[in-house]
């Protein structure tokens, strides 16, 4: 059980590596440029969803990117307090940047 935070572009090596290590017991929070990994129809959003991990996207970053209506199904928007609450549940975290 691991929290992955992804704030790099979906085209980055870090984003691909993150997807290869995910399990169904993990959680992913997309923020910064990482929110683009949640775009409906993208290969990486499919990899994320296929992993079985819980996937969240930081709402202020989604809104700033202008992709609020384009997130893939199964990716939940969260605010900053929810980001902190989720982070507090995980003793181990892997930051992908």
Place the predicted regions along the sequence by residue.
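A general structural motif
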Residues: 1, 25, 52, 90-91
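Short, basic, glycine/proline-bearing loop/turn elements
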Residues: 1-4, 27-33, 67-70
